[in-house]
Amino acid sequence: MEASLLKKNQSIELTIEDLTHDGSGVGKIDGYPLFIPNTLPGEKVTAKIIKLNKNYGFARMENIETVSADRVEPPCAVYSKCGGCSLQHLSYDGQLEFKRNQVEETMKRIGKLNVEVPETLGMENPWRYRNKSQVPVGFVNGKLTAGFYQKRSHAIIDMSTCLIHNEQGDFAVQKTREILAKYGTEPYDEQTGKGDIRHIMTRFAHTTGQLMIVLVTTKERMPFKEEIVRELVEQLELTSIVQNINPHKTNVIFGDRTKTLWGKDIIEDTIHGIRFAISARSFYQVNPIQTEVLYQQAIDAAELTGEETVIDAYCGIGSISLCLAKKAKHVYGVEIVDQAIQDARANAELNELANTTFETGKAEEVIPAWYKAGIVADVLVVDPPRKGCDEKLLETILAMKPKKVVYVSCNPGTLARDMKILTDGGYVAKKVQPVDMFPMTTHIEAVTVLHLN
């Protein structure tokens, strides 16, 4: 069939050739690509066209004529509606291979790099891994509910469990929901801006078993607040109950004010033997098992002997910095979020690591200032946000010439782009190691080390 003859709502038969970065299947009609969610390579499907653009279109799978050997039955009852996961229909081995292929293809296409991409480091059990649940609250069929948003919408799906949240946090969300409903707590309405409760968040410390509940409310006063707190304490094994107040008409989750309603201000967890104090708003990796795997890759890549000066750009609460400080002469960390730097300093003190310096600011401004002041890194670690490293920071790296750059990435596209700039500037990379931090989703983390040639 010619692509020019395709029409909206038309049913067509085609074979899926590949998966996109967001996990949709891709099939072609006369060279014209159609993106079809919930399909896998090798599958012959019947699909209904829902949108046609000039160079590509979208279709909805109606029937699978030939089923992929990698297809599995998703165990989650709301998987087809929920926006939380996108790969439950693909076997876990298939997910790991998909992520490896994504990294390899991105390195070649964007970075023009021919590097080794080994098998993705996955989990023994890829379920129940998230130590943080962040669940919106709303009305569904006239009753208070807590669940995830539907795909491409802000409609909340009523759900009794989430299979990627750890059991303790998951149970705490459901119990909190029951108690709020019992006291007639009114959920926040995005349209009107009215209501009392916006989100229920839980944080669970994997190594200590400590559990925090955060109630995100529209105002400090909430009907029956004392009774709700008392019942939570009676019915759950908790370390902390915290209230965050967000009075703004926005879809941003947190407001600026946080107060402890019961118990401690923080919970405590460990990574590679380093203790971390985690507050309601601390940035902290959500998969504790794979964080150890990811950081071990970074530690191994740094090859520290105790004589090195290390700079950690985008250091957050110091999680990588402090793991490296055990083996370095001195570690300097920089982070734009001041609260994270305060947390990093507190965590350094908690672990009696005096060989650390943390400063608030933009990495691309602070590191050049350090360089001018004579602070030169032997090893420079970057763990940037999805947008990758700032251009000015990359220029500083090329001027400073650290022997090694250890790059921890949450976006293969910007990793490939930045690696190309560094390799063009005299660095050599041999391997990029994917790590599966978020099973059942398309997110990919990767670690590489670039050596000065």
Curated annotation (Swiss-Prot):
The keyword Coiled coil does not apply. It is an enzyme of class 2 (transferase). InterPro entries: MeTrfase_TrmA_AS, MeTrfase_TrmA_CS, NA-bd_OB-fold, SAM-dependent_MTases_sf, TRAM_dom, U5_MeTrfase_fam. Gene3D superfamilies: 2.40.50.1070, Nucleic acid-binding proteins, Vaccinia Virus protein VP39. GO terms for biological process: rRNA base methylation. Keywords: 4Fe-4S, Iron, Iron-sulfur, Metal-binding, Methyltransferase, S-adenosyl-L-methionine, Transferase. S-adenosyl-L-methionine binds at Q285, Y314, E335, D383. PROSITE patterns: SAM_MT_RNA_M5U, TRAM, TRMA_1, TRMA_2. Its EC number is 2.1.1.-. [4Fe-4S] cluster binds at C76, C82, C85, C162. One of its GO terms (molecular function) is 4 iron, 4 sulfur cluster binding. Residues 5-63 form the TRAM domain. The active site is at C410 (nucleophile). Pfam families: TRAM, tRNA_U5-meth_tr. It comes from the Bacteria. Belongs to the class I-like SAM-binding methyltransferase superfamily. RNA M5U methyltransferase family. This is Uncharacterized RNA methyltransferase LMOf2365_1776.
